[in-house]
């Protein structure tokens, strides 16, 4: 069976045929590392990690590259506000990024290049664009001449005249056309900068990815992916830069994931409704957040709320219960083979359905439905006192196979959570017995474990401390 991918470039699903049989070159735009990542950043990390895992499951050798933007206006602003230098802030939040996405079940990319480590390549790329007549220098700044590239607008499906409407040249900008964009920005106000043929400065945002893709993956790649908000102008500008330089198609397939809304409102700083992964994973099982993200097709928007996350947790726990019950039944399993063929065929049918759904533009929402159908069949099998070791192992094996691709685990977490819950119950018992000394002692013990308690009318809640 073939994999079909919805290609933003053509606005249709296409059969996935990599440039080189059996191998996939994939690039995902990474974060600007000036703060902890929010759930809007987490969605592409989870989505494209799952795409990568499914491609590998399907037998492809995937070379997966995702960058860090470690110099940018936002980073410079954060450095000024905190009184620290840009590299220190970037290092801190790159480490925080790895911790957060690791908790969410994401593998590291094969390579995580940083902008600041590739400055020579970026400068050389810009020089070539100038030589070819696609860019021009203006008093230390360098701009890309958008009208020089005939295909501009093909990714976002807009004509250059449509884009021209509403475009403005800001005060102080030296570009010739309102649609032109910066490849190199002259240094100002003693901000971090690098030497270049045009004087001290730093690169524009769009050129960074073009240069790093070319350096680490080549002129043309199989899959370029990122959030829907990057389609224009970022990815459109990447195409203009890269195809002008090489004369070749930049990427064969373009994938974009949908937005996340918070309580039915668009997530934005002005609304103050950013939700940091750093905070969620202190209170929630990270697997539940990943499960939540994959419960909706990646191209569709997601509405996030704590109520929805709690509902997702309940559904996730039902799967965990079925999986745990299979393991318990395995302990008393037998070698009876009656009806094995029928039940093994049912398991294989679910495997085939999982593959079919994932082959259809990585439909994780329907793939998760397969898990619930598998759980339903497993529950029926056990409720009717079937005990075949072969069948039980087949159910367990397919649960593990699917969840390893989707990137979460149904294994019971026996460590911190259970210990904390047991201590809270002991403390509640002490309080009921008015043994406040023991109650305080248990609270102090939990505090030493970095666990913060909150006593409410509905009971005691806990979370991990800062």
Swiss-Prot record:
CDD domains: CysRS_core
Enzyme class: ligase
Residues that span the membrane, as ranges: none
Binding note for cofactor: Binds 1 zinc ion per subunit.
Binding of Zn(2+), residues: 29, 209, 234, 238
Superkingdom of the source species: Bacteria
Position of sequence motif 'HIGH' region: 31-41
Cofactor(s) in the UniProt record: Zn(2+)
Motif 'KMSKS' region, residue numbers: 266-270
Keywords carried by this UniProt record: Aminoacyl-tRNA synthetase, ATP-binding, Cytoplasm, Ligase, Metal-binding, Nucleotide-binding, Phosphoprotein, Protein biosynthesis, Zinc
EC number of this enzyme: 6.1.1.16
Residues at which ATP binds: 269
In-chain residues carrying the UniProt-annotated modification Phosphoserine: 270
Family: Belongs to the class-I aminoacyl-tRNA synthetase family.
Listed name of the protein: Cysteine--tRNA ligase
Source organism per UniProt: Bacillus pumilus (strain SAFR-032)
